[in-house]
Amino acid sequence: MHDITREFVGLASPLVGRAGAGGHPCQGIYHRPEGHRPTTAFIATHYNVDFSEHYLAPYLAERGYGFLGWNTRFRGNEPYFLLDHALAEIGVGVRWLKEVAGVERVVLLGNSGGGSLMAAYQSQAVEPNVLPTAGGRPVDAIQHLDAGDLFVALAAHSGRPEVLTNWMDPSVTDETDALSVDPDLDPFGPRNPAPYDAEFQRRYRAAQRARNERITNWALERLDALRGTRARDQLFQLHRTWADLRMIDPAIEPSDRRPNWCYLGDPARANYGMFGIGTLSTLRTWLSMWSLRTSQCIAAPHLARITVPSLVVHATADACVYDSDADALFRHLAAPDKRLETVKSDHYLQEPDGTRSLAADLIANWVAERTP
């Protein structure tokens, strides 16, 4: 095993300047074996989570690879996310690997929510297709992105709109009232105890999609109403986004996951808490990232443009990524050379001990088989 060198990387964005305090909009940490310049390196980016110190970075660096944990300006800044802007800033990181770090082959690592984001990056690089959101200006920088040479999806979600819709509580009757509830759809109420029957599941899923569509209709109407005023956009809240029936009922898509559990613990408590995905958005961010109708953050169409060798690694005890998600990712990939592997662990590969090392071996060996 190698000792590891960690190098902070701060770079300009093609879209915005440095912060007044001096910070670069694009930032990350490059991990590599000490005294060695790898010719193959990974890059991992998420929609809003800080991946600069990604948990796999030291493991893959120990195995001889470079690893750039890369953040766009939307790290910790989810309410303002725009896909085309994020792709341009991922491109800054990929270009740095090739032009400065001396990397010849880039592996795009799409982990967790980053699965659909990195798929969108590769898709745009090989066949430009991403459009500005709701009247935004075209981003020239995404027309000539450097494509990745391999693609890895690790414990990856199927896309932001699907994840939010599958997790959102459709019993909300008033988007301005976090306590409003339709008791006939309340997954935690006495009328609907788990295990849930097929009819309730059908009604529930339909109501989730209907809630997403209602918010999209409202967002489009508000943008239209703001046209010609002093405001170009506005922020709004979204309540109760920890209510996927699979979090509560382990009989739906059985797996190794802990029953009645989500990433924040007890789903009933998390659902009425302050933390969750999509809890605050601008109108344009909703349309760019969360809307089933308008978002381009859905993985499937992007995966259909990915033809480089691809690996999907699924954690079978993941609380909120299910077997059907991994199967769909694998199915939609257009790569002739693709593989689906599983590890018996949670979303972050924390338990049992040694799982991260096992996953790193799996990924490193797969890459080694496909690179000189």
Where are these regions (language model features)?
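Catalytic histidine-centered segment of alpha/beta-hydrolase-like enzymes
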Residues: 345-357
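Alpha/beta-hydrolase-fold enzymes
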Residues: 140-263
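Short beta-strand/loop motif that positions the catalytic acidic residue
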Residues: 306, 312-314, 318
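Catalytic nucleophile-loop/oxyanion-hole region of alpha/beta-hydrolase
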Residues: 48, 73-107, 357
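Primarily recognizes the serine-hydrolase "nucleophile elbow" in alpha/beta-hydrolase
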Residues: 96-99, 105-176
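Short, surface-exposed "cap/lid" segments of acyl-processing enzymes
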Residues: 32-65, 69-76
